[in-house]
Amino acid sequence: MDITKKIKSYEDACKALNLDPANLPVVDNLPEKDRKYIVAYYKLTVIIRALNEGWEPNWQDWDEYKYFNWFYIDFAGFAYALTNCAVSYANTYFGSRLCFKNATLARYARETFESLYLDYLFIEIPQTYNNNSKK
């Protein structure tokens, strides 16, 4: 079965990984403005782990493509760009947990879990963000 048919929510990802969706990071002692981003990051890592179906990036393999969702704000509002190591390069021996095994999964996650990405990336959603201006 296509994993994108199976993982449509954080709860679906938890079910696929045998995790309790109610077991979220404890953020009560953190500043209020940081809490939502910490929980969103955790949820994204769970979702991405489920979508990747056990695949983990090999950071020693320079020939293995790894896909990330990149976002930026321009004067028109919130925008999206997909990249991989063929388009841009960063050297690290510690991997990103927000890494996908293929571009299809990266795009799917960006479209399906956009609100989690926004919670992770911004303390406040920019007022110039227009949900209809996806690139």
Where are these regions (language model features)?
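Short acidic DE-rich linear segments
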Residues: 128-135
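Helix-coil modules at protein/domain termini and other flexible surface or pore-lining loops
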Residues: 52, 74-76, 87, 107, ...
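Charge-rich, low-complexity N-terminal segments
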Residues: 1-34
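Short, compact, well-ordered microdomains
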Residues: 85-126
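Alpha-helix boundary/N-cap detector
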Residues: 8, 32-42, 101-104, 108
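Short aromatic-glycine-(Arg/Gly/Cys) micro-motifs in beta-strand/loop hairpins
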Residues: 63-95
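Assembly/interface hotspot detector across virion components, adhesins/toxins, and nucleic-acid enzymes
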Residues: 7-8, 58, 71
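Acidic, glycine-rich loop-and-strand cores that form catalytic or ligand-binding grooves
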Residues: 27-65
